[in-house]
Amino acid sequence: NKVNIIDFDYCKREIRAYDISNFMIKVLKRCNWNLEYAKEIINAYNSVSPLRDDEYKVLYAYLQFPQRYWRLANRYYYNEVNWGQNTFSNKIESIINEQEKFTKFLDDFKKEYSL
């Protein structure tokens, strides 16, 4: 029973809502922004360490931030990856194409947690 730590250079001190939102986004973008998956993640987290009401508001704010657009634009601008123009175009189109599902998810999340 050993634990191996990877990417320790990304380690930082941050509020809980930040970590939860990052994990949720990674999962939900692969699950068509299904609210049920988000609820399962939050319920599992709450079973160990319940979120406070104010943390739900911060979590919602983090979920609204266009992180994926920003990260993609940042990588493109600073030439952080060796992708051709078509790769960037395809990635941005993919994010745009899921915008309707993402917006519906945000609305449903807001209603579910009375935000």
Predicted regions mapped to residue ranges:
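All-alpha amphipathic helical-bundle segments outside canonical DNA-binding/catalytic cores
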Residues: 53-62
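Alpha-helical structural elements
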Residues: 3-5, 40, 65, 78, ...
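ATP/Mg2+ or Mg2+-diphosphate-binding catalytic cores
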Residues: 70-115
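Active-site acidic catalytic loop and adjacent metal/ATP-binding pocket
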Residues: 1-18
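Active-site activation/catalytic loop segments of kinase-like enzymes and analogous catalytic loops
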Residues: 17-50, 64-81
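Short amphipathic alpha-helical surface patches that serve as generic macromolecular interface elements
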Residues: 38-42, 56, 89
